[in-house]
Amino acid sequence: MTNELPEIGSPARTKAILNRYRLVAKKSLGQNFLSDLNILRNIVAAGDVNDHDNVIEIGPGIGALTEQIAKRAHKVVAFEIDENLLPVLDETLMDYKNVKIINEDILKANLPAVVADEFEADRPLKLVANLPYYITTPILMGVLQSTVRFEAIVVMMQAEVAERLVAEPGTKAYGSLSVIMQYRAHVEIAFNVPRTAFIPQPNVDSAIIRLTPREALPVNPYEDKALFSFVKGCFAHRRKSLWNNLQGIFGKQPEVRERIETVLNQTGISRQLRPERLTLLNFIELTNAFHNEGLM
């Protein structure tokens, strides 16, 4: 390295870059620039990134996290939707030849094609990113449902959303997002990030989530889409009993009610339970049972 400038994620360098390019964080893109080197390094460490790994990043901003990843990874491909940041990244990351920036919306990108074109197939692939908070869930669902196999996913998100992802049955935060995300991956909070670590400061606290995509479950639904739809329907009125929510999904006709009762008896799940008490495996079991009963 010939560049002796402070690292991009230091407060002084971040402010200098923002001032030089007259950059203002765009609320429409959920932009806040992380300017704490310890946190940036800890994010990369949470993904256990090493020189054998290929890494996808989403929303590199001015390159603060990208730099820390590039120092440890074999190669980094980062998706940046904001064209105004491209010349900034060209400058800030000019010394890192193992970084490629793609100016594309990750929600519209052909991720399998990008991975096939940019990375060797025999290297582990990881996702490490400070996600735009307003599209955190669509990004994660898209990534987890794609054919691309990630060894690990480490992302920053709003702390409140993170709590929902890791929530357990019977807790206030437990809901459809908890069930669906935990179906796709083992989820844990690596650590929390205070709002003071950003320029400008957001109005919410943040957390780093680590997801490890699942290999297999003891029981699998006959169809993922059906499971997701069923789970969302069960949580449509979370204060109501499972029985009432099931009638909302399938109908209240006498014949339908009888078939719902049959499934509940078969599975041994009480009609009086609220959906928040059901486990992931309960939801899968019910999805398959209602399918077998001809209701799905």
Swiss-Prot record:
Q: Which family does it belong to?
A: Belongs to the class I-like SAM-binding methyltransferase superfamily. rRNA adenine N(6)-methyltransferase family. RsmA subfamily.
Localization per record: Cytoplasm
Gene Ontology molecular-function annotations: 16S rRNA (adenine(1518)-N(6)/adenine(1519)-N(6))-dimethyltransferase activity; RNA binding
Q: Please provide the record's keywords in A-Z order.
A: Cytoplasm, Methyltransferase, RNA-binding, rRNA processing, S-adenosyl-L-methionine, Transferase
Q: Which SUPFAM superfamilies match?
A: S-adenosyl-L-methionine-dependent methyltransferases
Q: What does this protein do?
A: Specifically dimethylates two adjacent adenosines (A1518 and A1519) in the loop of a conserved hairpin near the 3'-end of 16S rRNA in the 30S particle. May play a critical role in biogenesis of 30S subunits.
Q: What is its main location?
A: cytoplasm
Give the domain of life: Bacteria
Q: Which organism's genome codes for this protein?
A: Levilactobacillus brevis (strain ATCC 367 / BCRC 12310 / CIP 105137 / JCM 1170 / LMG 11437 / NCIMB 947 / NCTC 947)
* UniProt name for this protein: Ribosomal RNA small subunit methyltransferase A
Main EC class of this protein? transferase
Pfam families associated with the record: RrnaAD
E.C. number(s) listed in UniProt: 2.1.1.182
Gene3D superfamilies, alphabetized = Ribosomal RNA adenine dimethylase-like, domain 2, Vaccinia Virus protein VP39
This protein's record includes keyword rRNA-binding: no
Q: Which InterPro entries match?
A: KsgA/Erm, rRNA_Ade_diMease-like_C, rRNA_Ade_Mease_Trfase_CS, rRNA_Ade_methylase_Trfase_N, rRNA_adenine_dimethylase, SAM-dependent_MTases_sf
**For S-adenosyl-L-methionine, which residues are the binding ones?**
32, 34, 59, 80, 105, 130
Q: Which reaction does it catalyse?
A: adenosine(1518)/adenosine(1519) in 16S rRNA + 4 S-adenosyl-L-methionine = N(6)-dimethyladenosine(1518)/N(6)-dimethyladenosine(1519) in 16S rRNA + 4 S-adenosyl-L-homocysteine + 4 H(+)
- For the keyword rRNA processing, the answer is yes
Q: Please name the CDD domains in this protein's record.
A: AdoMet_MTases
